[in-house]
Structures are given as structure tokens and as C-alpha cells.
């Protein structure tokens, strides 16, 4: 096999690959064996015609497609490995020469991983995040706990106020006609939460139990349902109950009820410790992010658009999966947000480009600094994963493919490199 490599444009190479006749003949024979049952040749039962007869009857071109796929795929893989080429997309294949008793010649044009020009990366200056927890932070968090443990109690001696929970029946009408999804019974609506259409909740303030209320609202122009967008609507509402939050008494008994501690002081001390741990973790993440951005900002790399597009694809798939866990799908989300798929993808572009650059720059530093995952690193990572999934380590190992192990090694090297950069950074 002969290979010529030419840089045809920025981050794009073209390989001219020549495969000898014998190798192409092997591909033709494999194509014949794969397709022989598809050919009808007079005088032969289907699938029994010899190859030379099929080629004479249909022309040898009838076997070219699969032969090309078989031969070109193997030749291309060998060529990029031998020439240390790192493609980031599928190649564009063009046949230059093909025929009986001829070497197969084809070109493969492909986008490759770009070269990274590193700037300063060891000892970079970055803003230091502090892990401070104030008394005010503690009180705010404690108040959330108290609110969470509040109970709703009915009130009958006053009208609805902001912050109350109103239990209502309602039915919506547009032009005096009920519309789908506009009806509910025994619905608990927190007044002032903004859960319903703008203006709906405000019109219930001052109303009493058993009141029938006509609520007039306008759906937003981009509400998410075409039949409701911008429409005027009337809701017939019955006030069935008014509830208010009753906060628990904050004392040692409260601490005992919600925790393993006997006193309120012990509970608050534990809460402060947890807040401090959380603040410390956040500060570490923020410091890491500051260092990474400083390092990446000092580097130069011309990122191929295809790498950004692929990363956007992955981000969109991940977003869609998270939506499905919440009982939504991407199409419904786009309707609610009043956008289309292209607009949705575009919102990821800047972040995707930044994340691709981070990946490329850190990979380059790993290579320059000879940062690698050791066997012990890989073993530890596999053990952690097995424990997380409550699976025996040896069973998990059996499921790992070579590419899975390669991914684990690369990920470990990536994280080790970032740690080196952070440890050597000047945080101030």
C-alpha cells in the first residue's frame, strides 16, 4: 500500500492511497460472497452463479460498492495509523482508479485534530475563590430548613393574601369555549409564586372562601401552545380553602425531630460544618475553573467547526435525556421556549467551543508533560465505578472494551494534568 499525504487547507488533509491488485481482488471476492444471493442469472439457481458469470452478465461494477467499502475502510484505517493522523470526522472518499487487474487508487479528505500552540501554563495567575461561611449564611440555610418543615393550616377568618396557598377549582374559556388543559379541581396555588399566567394570582388576593371569581388574563405571545399564544381568556374560579404556613417552634425538640442531634446548638454546628464543606468544594471548583481559563486563554488553537458541531450534538443529546427524566421531550421544550432546533443548538455554541478548546489544550499539556494514567490509577477508577453501581469489580472489567479503557486512561490523565496546573498556579 502506498500513501501520499497532503495538507489541502487548515486542519484538513488529503490522503491518496494506492491498494495493490491482490488486495482489491480479495475485496471483490468478499463482495461476491456477500451479494451472490441477490443476483438472478439465467441457467443458474439464485445464489449459485459463479462470480465470473455474474461479472459477465451484470458487469464487474456490480460488486464494486461493497468491495470499495471493505478495502477502502481497512486501507484508510491503516494509513491514518501509519501516518499519525488524528481525524475528527468521517473522511470524504473519492475513487481515482478502479478496474480489473489495476491497483485501486482513492483519496480520503478528512478534517484532523488541530495543532495547539501553548502559552504559559505552569504558574499562571488566577483569582482565588474563598470558602467563607458567615453567620448570615448559616441563618439563611437554617431558615430554609424551618420553612421546609412548616405545615399548612386552614384559615377561615380572612381573605386571601400574598403568600397564602389557595385551594381552587377553575375552568378556562376563550371566546366562551372551554379549551384543553384549562380545567382543574382542588388545585393548590401559592399566591405570588408566578405559577399561573401573569395576572391570575393577583386577582385572587382579597377573595374569600366560597367566592366565585372571574379572572381575566392574556396568554403570553410565546406561551408555547399555538392555539393559546396571545389569546384573551376568562377563568371561572371557585375559592375552596385558604391555607397559611405555620412554622414549627424552633427548639431542642425541633432539632431532635429533624436530625440525630439532641440540641439545637449541635444541629446548627453540624449544619455549619456541612455548609463549610460545600463552600470549600465550590471554591476548589471555582479555582480550578479560573486556572483552566487562564491556561486556555494563553493558548492558540484553530478549532475545526466540525468539532464544535459534534460537541453541540452531544450536549443536545444530554439535555434531551435530562428532559425525558423530567417527563418532557425536546420537541415540547422547544414549543414552551418558543424556539426551533437550530436556535436551541445555537445557545450551546459558545460553551461548546470553549469546552473543545479546554480539551485540546489540556491534552496537549498532558503530552508535553508526559502525564499518563498508571495501572494503579485505572484499577482505582474501575473500583470506584463498580462500587457506585454496586457491581463486582471483576464483573465490570469483563464488560469493558478496549476503547472504554482508553477513555478511562485519557480521563484520568486529563484530571491529573488539571491538578498539576492548579497546584502550580498563583492564586490571589
From Swiss-Prot:
GO molecular function: peptidyl-prolyl cis-trans isomerase activity; protein folding chaperone; ribosome binding
Domain of life: Bacteria
Catalytic activity: [protein]-peptidylproline (omega=180) = [protein]-peptidylproline (omega=0)
SUPFAM superfamilies documented for this protein: FKBP-like, Triger factor/SurA peptide-binding domain-like, Trigger factor ribosome-binding domain
GO biological process: 'de novo' cotranslational protein folding; cell division; chaperone-mediated protein folding; protein transport; protein unfolding
Cited function: Involved in protein export. Acts as a chaperone by maintaining the newly synthesized protein in an open conformation. Functions as a peptidyl-prolyl cis-trans isomerase.
Family membership noted in the UniProt record: Belongs to the FKBP-type PPIase family. Tig subfamily.
Name of protein: Trigger factor
Native source species: Ruminiclostridium cellulolyticum (strain ATCC 35319 / DSM 5812 / JCM 6584 / H10) (Clostridium cellulolyticum)
